[in-house]
Amino acid sequence: SLKHIREYCASTALVQMALNIHNEVSPDHSTPLRQRQLQVLAGDFYSGKFYQILAHRGDTHVIHFLSDAVCLINQARTNLYDLFLNNQLSVEKYVHETEKICTALLKSWLQHERTKDNDNWDKLVSNLLTAEQLIADLSGTLPAYWPSSVNTQLQQKAWQLIEQSRLLVQDWDSQKTKRELEHLIEVTFPGVTHLGIAEEC
């Protein structure tokens, strides 16, 4: 029912919010302790609401696979941190772990809700969410020791993922879904042409 869909969407959004807030807790001790404690508590609050909604519905299976996704995300973030500390973070590893972080929650739903288009949805989710994050990371969250050429590599990778998504959507069976996905890509990545070249503003 529509109510169930809304509750599932709300639960997944709450999990993502909890992850985002916890990830923003600064390890820098110059940040006031109280501020960091409040951030942790805020993340715990959203995480608790996610459990509350699904437990009330008796959806233990959903709790289980979303919790598994959270574990995967946290492990990927730990991997990135360890690689960064040891100066072993390559572009390939960065993209690989970023893809896990960006897509684990939605992919857990795709594995739960099997459909004939499941493989296409899986590829589309991976491509678009990873591309979106890579473009965001180009704003300044990349390791300082990486050469400037890395920016070009990540930008090209993002464009490649976007173009792969466009080609994937072209073969979509449902024309309505195809139009909606094409619109989504154009709205989300307005400065990228079909050739993967940023348009002049």
Region annotations inferred by a language model:
Residues S1-C201:
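All-alpha prenyltransferase/terpene-synthase fold signal
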